[in-house]
Amino acid sequence: MRERLSTILFELKNGVVVVEGKHDVAVMERLGICTSTYERVMRGGLTVPEGAKVFILTDDDRRGSEKADAVSGFLSGSLGPCRLDRETGLRLLNLCNATSVEQVSKPIEK
């Protein structure tokens, strides 16, 4: 499990990560991962280097899914060539036995 967690965290650290809100930002910062919020992205405040991978990391609930869909649609229409990834965030949640981004730090920080 540790190796898979390390791999996922490495991927996230080397990409652009979008989360739902400020609490998620705080959790990811404690893990050394820089993020942008859903709100910032939807206001057009995200700059993505060409060819970068954008990880969409939302809670595993209806609202998180709706926000992930909105961000995916917005970024697909407004950015140049980039790769959107929603699966890595879900893998992280599953690996940490979490349903929200706020919950992932507990198993990782142990």
Task: Indicate residue ranges for each PLM-predicted region.
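Helix N-cap/beta->alpha junction signal
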Residues: 21-22, 60
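TOPRIM fold recognition
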Residues: 13, 27-31, 36, 40-110
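Phosphate-handling DNA/RNA-contact segment within nucleic-acid enzymes
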Residues: 1-16, 22-26
